[in-house]
């Protein structure tokens, strides 16, 4: 049986991900107590159901300590995939304010006896981060701070379509001025490279546009940077695989996330297309966010 476990921070998009999996034919359960999961999986497996998706969050806080051992046990018996959704505190506060929904931990006792009840939304969010943090290492993290729901649905579809035996390698471009990605495993700073932004004709374009590609492709220092990152990853990818890592997010950052990081992320994704399942995401590039095939693109293998 294939089991997709969705966890992470409340407000980060778990319901969107669960709905996408339901549309893909999964039997979906929200807020399942962790200790019930093995029994449910056995029951559905015996009934002929081959796809199960479960969302678990801080509402199950009393059982969260059981999750690491449970994940290891289920991984031995099933095709288990763990998706950890995260978002910045600012983005989460905005989402809760817009929906006027109460955070699951609002009004709950603080772990600090001097604080008493968690009175503010920000306190509840930070407490939840502490509770679910141990689960992040078991799955692939997605920072949904800037993602629209339709883009997250597309990413979830990519996630479940990948071969479970392959390493999923995501190259994510971003701009430092908008903050670093929460989901990055490795991060490379390419701000030392010449910036197309200072060419007025290139400024409104992105690293996906041919004039910017031609500008950067003609610079030896850009290729040196790409070669160095490529060599580093080629050396260490086998070690990540030996460590049973199924997912690796490589973040490439420039100032605005529009030109250099986009070009380098695309170039590296093409180089690694035959070595792993590769996805490239451009977090901050001003591309059409409704055209998810550009924002979250699976690189075709040769």
Swiss-Prot record:
This protein's UniProt keywords: ATP-binding, GTP-binding, Nucleotide-binding
Keyword Oxidoreductase: no
GO molecular function: ATP binding; GTP binding
Record InterPro entries: P-loop_NTPase (IPR027417), RapZ-like (IPR005337), RapZ-like_N (IPR053930), RapZ_C (IPR053931)
Binding site for GTP: 57-60
Bilayer-spanning residue ranges: none
Keyword Mitochondrion listed: no
Binding locations of ATP: 8-15
Function: Displays ATPase and GTPase activities.
Family as reported in the entry's similarity comment: Belongs to the RapZ-like family.
UniProt name for this protein: Nucleotide-binding protein Bmul_0520/BMULJ_02739
Organism of derivation: Burkholderia multivorans (strain ATCC 17616 / 249)
Lineage: Bacteria, Pseudomonadati, Pseudomonadota, Betaproteobacteria, Burkholderiales
């Amino acid at each position: 049986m294939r089991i997709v476990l969705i966890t992470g921070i409340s407000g980060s998009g778990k319901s969107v991900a669960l709905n996408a999996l339901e549309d893909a034919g999964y039997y979906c359960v929200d807020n399942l107590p962790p200790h019930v999961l093995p029994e449910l999986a056995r029951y559905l497996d015996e009934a002929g159901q081959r796809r199960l998706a479960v969302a678990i969050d801080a509402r199950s806080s009393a059982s969260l300590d059981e999750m690491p051992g449970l994940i290891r046990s289920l991984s031995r018996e099933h095709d288990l995939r763990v998706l950890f959704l995260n978002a910045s505190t600012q983005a989460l506060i905005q989402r809760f304010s817009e929906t006027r929904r109460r955070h699951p931990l609002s009004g709950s006792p603080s772990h600090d006896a001097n604080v008493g009840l968690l009175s503010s939304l920000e306190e509840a969010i930070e407490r939840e981060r502490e509770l679910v943090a141990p689960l992040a290492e078991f799955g692939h993290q997605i920072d949904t701070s800037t993602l629209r729901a339709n883009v997250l649905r597309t990413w979830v579809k990519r996630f479940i379509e990948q071969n479970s035996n392959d390493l999923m390698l995501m190259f994510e471009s971003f701009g430092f001025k908008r903050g670093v990605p929460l989901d990055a495993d490795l991060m490379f700073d390419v701000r030392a490279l010449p910036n197309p932004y200072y060419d007025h004709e290139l400024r409104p374009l992105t690293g996906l546009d041919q004039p910017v590609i031609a500008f950067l492709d003609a610079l030896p220092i850009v290729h040196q940077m790409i070669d160095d990152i490529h060599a580093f990853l080629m050396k260490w990818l086998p070690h990540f695989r030996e460590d049973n890592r199924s997912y690796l997010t490589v973040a490439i950052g420039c100032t605005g996330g529009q030109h250099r990081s986009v070009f380098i992320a695309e170039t590296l994704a093409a180089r690694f297309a035959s070595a792993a399942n590769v996805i490239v995401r451009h977090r901050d590039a001003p591309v059409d966010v409704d055209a998810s095939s550009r924002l979250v693109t699976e690189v075709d293998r040769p």
